[in-house]
């Protein structure tokens, strides 16, 4: 899929030529899972799969939206007044961004026809919703001279998720999608929002995305429950030590103060947040140093913690990761994203990718009963206007 596909679709849908094209990628997180709402570090990158849009103006004072993925045409009419309440549809993400940007001072002076199509598997944990949010933010900011900085668009997207969609997500997804750079990952301190770009040099290895094809509904999953558990654990720790977030603690500091947390489940949740943050720092340094063996071990250790301390995997993800680690040429593997379905990643020697996909796919099909899908990820730039 590319911009030509959406410009052709735009003409078929609206009967005229598109004036602009845009793209927003999906994302994978190399390591640093469920740390973004705990004041820790994350290490994501944008990928070449994503969401495209072809856009043209109209004189209807309306946003006419068509999604090729859902094969639905939608009409948002109140671009000069108040928007409708959310309806549990894909249009909520467009409308949510428009509402937040309008509140922040955006001035929508005319209508738009927007044709959207993407190649991110829906519900796969590659951030299709955040990709759509950042796509919309880029479109509206560009075509209405919004003047918003990229980090402002990131915060608008988080606000849409938290206040409009109803998901207590952190900042990582929108940040990675808006701020991504080709062939680089971003080490982001979510506590301070300081970040640095680090080259992803894998040598003879590639990143293989493994899609369980089990949909995960973020708002309906236990994502919000995990965040609440971490907040409870932090509150207990704060009764005995001065700490603002779990991400501020070292492993030793956490181990010395676990007696403050009375619930063994909460200890497990907080331990993941603390230790995952430290793993992320170690992994980013290992990648900088060209120590891919250590990097792979830390990626795999993250997966173990997500399965046993944070308990966000499940039989589908566990089957993929366990069998991935048995294959020749694999440096590391783990789930990526919020969990409860969705995707995992593996770092695989390029010479072994074909056998890897055949073997892991066969075992998955035999155990789960349906196919997993595999993609070799290219690390891409963030959201942008294409023409």
UniProtKB/Swiss-Prot annotation:
Catalytically driven reaction(s): alpha-D-galactose + ATP = alpha-D-galactose 1-phosphate + ADP + H(+)
Residues annotated as binding ATP: 67, 123-129
One Pfam family of this chain: GHMP_kinases_C
UniProt keyword terms in alphabetical order: ATP-binding, Carbohydrate metabolism, Cytoplasm, Galactose metabolism, Kinase, Magnesium, Metal-binding, Nucleotide-binding, Transferase
Keyword Transferase in record: yes
Entry's Gene Ontology cellular component terms: cytosol
Residues that coordinate or bind substrate: 33-36, 223
Active-site residues, as the UniProt record annotates them: 173 (proton acceptor)
EC number: 2.7.1.6
Keyword Cytoplasm: yes
Pathway note: Carbohydrate metabolism; galactose metabolism
Gene Ontology BP terms: galactose metabolic process
Gene Ontology MF, one: galactokinase activity
Gene3D superfamilies: 3.30.230.10, GHMP kinase, C-terminal domain
Enzyme class: transferase
Subcellular location: Cytoplasm
Domain of life from the UniProt record: Bacteria
Annotated site residue numbers, Transition state stabilizer: 27
Sites where the protein binds Mg(2+): 129, 161
Family: Belongs to the GHMP kinase family. GalK subfamily.
Task of the protein: Catalyzes the transfer of the gamma-phosphate of ATP to D-galactose to form alpha-D-galactose-1-phosphate (Gal-1-P).
Protein's recorded name: Galactokinase
Organism: Lacticaseibacillus casei (Lactobacillus casei)
Name of the gene: galK
